[in-house]
Amino acid sequence: MKGIALEGGSSKGAYHLGVLKALFERGYKFKGAVGTSIGAFNAAMIVQGNFDVCYNMWKNMQPETLFNVDNQFMENLLDKNIDRSMLEYASTEAKKVIANKGIDTTKLRRILDTYIDEDKIRASKMDFGLVIVEFDGLKPVPVEIFKEDIPKGKIKDYIMASANLPVFKSEDIDGKFFIDGGFYDNCPLRLLESKGYDDLIAVRVSPNRKLREPIKEDTKFIEIKPSEPLGRGLIFSNDTIRRNMLRGYFDRIKKIEGLKGNKYYIDGITDDEFMNRLISYPDEKILPYAESRGVVGKNPKRILFEDLIPETAEALKMGKDATYQDIFIELLESIAEGKKIKKFKVYSLDEFIDCINKSEDDDSSSSRLSELKKAAFRLAKPIEKITPITFKESILKEFEESMLDDIGYHVSQLESYEKNEDKDDDGWD
């Protein structure tokens, strides 16, 4: 059976919605959904059949939606625009938190009452489960539970308890106190596994936290995690939320469909095709590098494969399992970031190269890039005698100045070729 587990992480839960949107668009169906903290809320919305409602709720989220906080204060805080009035406001709010013995969760509860429908959850054919931690004052006791074992009328309470961070005002369920389930299992794959699920997807939002992986060897699971940090969990900035929803959407496509890249989304070519491009790289472009290193009597292609590429991989801190194409794309991404190339788009390898070639240098990095354009195979010194930044940047601009034109095939050239092919194809336009 196929199930999905959503990791807890407060505002970072927006990432779940992007991943789920991409999964549902491609026909994925799940027999069960579980989660911890905000993951439990999002899982409940899936189970009750209200994904679109949940998606739009997140898309329109504002800081004041969940907490009694001034929106302008949050904007100034995010912009690091801190003045005396902000400090006074923060001091006043801190006193309220202390007086109330925690952050007021009235608005959080209102969200649950507005969106969660216990009857729909219980009537759904999908399994729903969550993790909470009971705390009796002496020791925490983890509670992993499915909907059929939650007392009637208490599903909202259990979801609320699953998200009960210690900084929140504590609430009890029938005299028992609970804290955030993330203190035990923040992404409850094993909860699904305990019910017979053997095909699992884990949607992470805090990938640095240890994941409790499935126990059974025959259980399949895919881990989808952010390509970049999602920000602070308790900051509900609408811009950040929307960006994380987009990131989730494209990270899912990258993971399931095997796209390449770390910060971009690139539909690569086969390793054999890329190897052919490297082999076709002109010897006359390699020879200046050989001369700068005092390499005599060595085949230019050996210089490329035995010197340039390994040193580039080391400078970029690429693992030993990195392919030649992986190294090439890592260089591309470094250049693309400097030029502020749009991230949330799926590029073919050649589209990505063409986009970089056509783009203008961003003002903030133009001077750096201009200096780098002067570097052409400046690798005469051994790598350990060159600072990592200098070495990496010199590679970047040699790569941008020369290798992009020879290893990459421009989209415009491809389009021209395809048009000619179309005209020659039995007369069809």
What is the predicted function of each stretch?
Residues 1-36, 44-429:
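Patatin-like phospholipase
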